[in-house]
């Protein structure tokens, strides 16, 4: 069955506000099924998992279900799923627990293309424990991380490499396979942030061979919950515990505080939403995710191609980067018009976009020196008619 965008739009009552939402890189709209699930779960699962009473058992079941749902999302073992408030929080906890990998004589590699959530924790850990920091640089023409640089960056002293699988600012997709092999050859770990790619691509931690991956549920319309997943759950034991519970085991060793069980129920509902984007999808949740994400990808590729052709038709618009592989996210500048003014003009026309994402890559490319960049991204409910509205509003700036 073809992707039915009208049906998908019907799953999001908030689209009734009349706004055109091209601000997907900041998080997609919450489907009604997720909002309803969260509300119901907060009424039923308010207690912690400690105890033998029904509410505690329901909370424990919600926690288990959330780990299983995230595991299906990334093709992993539920025993390796760590849950928390946000991927930035989880990565900070992981970095805090990584003293054995960030000490004197060791090296940590981070990327200029990443969100700050996957940079700042490792910089702090390196400063605290004495490791040397190396940077994977961006090709200023394409906006990608060139694969040739990994051989010169990775050494016997490398203990950890942190990268994203796709940029939430430029949209470029990172080639992970060659890099992960080099990293593993020296006994180091690879931490991959999938937050930008998760709404658009079927994730597979085994296929990329990453050791740890992170996602943010709000990226695809889930609640504000992050997940950090270990390909091999036993690797968690090589990190120090950050839990306030001295008896914590497994994922709980890297979790702090009491879980928000209502939000965790929403994570499950949001992954079910992804698995049902294509009504024809059948089978296990992982199988339904594979079908639905493929259908969504095919649809969004058509809309994104139309968006790119339309933007290139505007003489004052300059696209930033030319990645070969791309999620449906793009940044651009408008000649002699600051990004915040462009975004305000779009808002005046009922269109939401993002001015200056805060990514270091915009500084590297010199974009912030000439007024900054506007970032737009498609969501599962985006249409070609909305692209036309965006282009008309941008054309009015000329």
UniProtKB/Swiss-Prot annotation:
Residues of the signal peptide = none
Disruption-associated phenotype: Cells lacking this gene display impaired growth.
Q: Which GO terms describe its cellular component?
A: peptidoglycan-based cell wall; plasma membrane
| NCBIfam families, per database record | am_tr_V_VC1184 (TIGR01976)
Explain the purpose of this protein.
Is essential for optimal growth.
Q: Which family is this sequence assigned to?
A: Belongs to the class-V pyridoxal-phosphate-dependent aminotransferase family.
Q: How does it assemble?
A: Homodimer.
Other comments on record: Was identified as a high-confidence drug target.
Q: Indicate what this protein is called per its UniProt record.
A: Uncharacterized protein Rv3778c
Natural source organism: Mycobacterium tuberculosis (strain ATCC 25618 / H37Rv)
Q: What is the lineage of its organism?
A: Bacteria, Bacillati, Actinomycetota, Actinomycetes, Mycobacteriales
């Amino acid at each position: 069955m073809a992707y039915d965008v009208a049906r998908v739009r019907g799953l999001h009552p908030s689209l009734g506000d009349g706004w055109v939402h091209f601000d997907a890189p900041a998080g997609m709209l919450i489907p009604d099924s997720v909002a309803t699930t969260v509300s119901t779960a907060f009424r039923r699962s308010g207690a912690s998992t400690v105890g033998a009473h029904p509410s505690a058992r329901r909370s424990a079941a919600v926690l288990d279900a959330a780990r299983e749902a995230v595991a299906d999302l990334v093709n992993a073992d539920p025993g390796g799923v760590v849950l928390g408030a946000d991927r930035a929080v989880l990565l900070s906890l992981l970095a805090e627990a990584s003293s054995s990998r960030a000490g004197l004589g060791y090296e940590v590699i981070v990327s200029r293309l990443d969100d700050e959530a996957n940079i700042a924790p490792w910089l702090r850990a390196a400063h605290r424990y004495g490791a040397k920091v190396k940077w994977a640089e961006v090709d200023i023409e394409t906006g990608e991380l060139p694969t040739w640089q990994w051989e010169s960056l990775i050494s016997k002293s490398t203990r950890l490499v942190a990268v994203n699988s796709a940029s939430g600012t430029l949209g470029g997709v990172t080639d992970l396979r060659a890099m992960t092999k080099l990293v593993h050859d020296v006994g180091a770990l690879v931490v991959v942030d999938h937050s930008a790619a998760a709404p658009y691509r079927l994730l597979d931690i085994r296929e990329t061979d990453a050791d740890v991956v992170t996602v943010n549920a709000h990226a695809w319309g889930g609640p504000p919950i992050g997940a950090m997943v270990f390909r091999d759950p036993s690797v968690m034991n090589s990190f120090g515990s950050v839990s306030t519970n001295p008896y914590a085991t497994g994922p709980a060793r890297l979790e702090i505080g009491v879980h928000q069980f209502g939000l965790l129920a929403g994570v499950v509902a949001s992954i079910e939403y992804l698995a049902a984007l294509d009504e024809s999808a059948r089978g296990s949740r992982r199988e339904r995710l594979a079908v639905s994400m493929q259908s969504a990808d095919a649809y969004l590729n058509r809309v994104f191609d139309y968006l790119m052709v339309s933007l290139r038709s505007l003489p004052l618009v300059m696209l930033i980067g030319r990645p070969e592989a791309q999620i449906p996210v793009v940044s651009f500048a408008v000649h002699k018009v600051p990004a915040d003014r462009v975004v305000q003009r779009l808002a005046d026309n009922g269109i939401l976009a993002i001015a200056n994402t805060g990514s270091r890559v915009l500084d590297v490319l010199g974009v912030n020196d000439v007024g900054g960049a506007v970032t737009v991204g498609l969501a599962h409910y985006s249409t070609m008619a909305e692209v036309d509205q965006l282009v008309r509003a941008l054309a009015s700036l000329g």
